[in-house]
């Protein structure tokens, strides 16, 4: 188990060496802008994905977390598309679709498009500084990344694990007195079966 306070997470963001573990894709922006590099984050660790994503934003890159199962060939194709097509001027980060049509596709978002909605979203789902949410999955999926950042935005606690064992999930849920769960329906069914 790894635990981070907000201060430790901030220190990890500042000290993250994103250039050694992720792929930088340069592109020529349509207009003059400081943001001309997309960082394709390739890491299996949820915590490292989060730290690198936040560090990339902090350092002026446009981060995009690659799905864990993406092969090198597709990442190369994605890098070529980004390099040749660029990204919208308003883009602060990229997310990938789930790939239901065969291959994940990039979607470009602005920080504002999320941050302006967090308070509304958190109110709807009763998320605040006392929230303890369990979630399972990769930070590369937009629902997971949105929920993590929304909970951190409110000052809440995020609990996750790389374990695929529902019994481990239940242990963590009980240990940390989790009051919210965010998971795909298939994972929720697994969880219910083991309760």
Language-model segments: residues:
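Conserved AMP-binding A3 loop
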Residues: 92-119
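Short hydrophobic alpha-helical segments of the AMP-binding
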Residues: 52-57, 114, 147-152
């Amino acid at each position: 188990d790894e635990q981070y306070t907000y201060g430790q997470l901030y220190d990890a963001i500042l000290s993250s060496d994103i250039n050694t573990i992720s792929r930088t894709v340069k592109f020529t922006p349509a207009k003059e802008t400081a943001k001309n590099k997309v960082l394709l984050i390739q890491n299996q660790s949820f915590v490292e994905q989060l730290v690198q994503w936040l560090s990339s934003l902090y350092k002026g890159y446009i981060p995009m977390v690659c799905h864990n199962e993406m092969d090198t060939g597709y990442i190369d194709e994605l890098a070529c598309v980004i390099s040749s097509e660029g990204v919208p001027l308003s883009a602060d980060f990229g997310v990938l679709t789930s790939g239901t049509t065969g291959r994940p596709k990039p979607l470009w978002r602005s920080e504002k498009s999320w941050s302006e909605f967090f308070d509304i979203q958190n109110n709807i789902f009763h998320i605040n500084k006392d929230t303890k949410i369990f979630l399972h999955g990769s930070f590369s999926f937009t629902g997971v990344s949105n929920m993590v950042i929304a909970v951190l935005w409110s000052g809440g606690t995020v609990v996750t694990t790389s374990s695929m064992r529902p019994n481990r999930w239940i242990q963590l849920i009980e240990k940390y007195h989790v009051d919210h769960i965010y998971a795909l329906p298939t994972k929720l069914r697994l969880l219910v079966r083991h309760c």
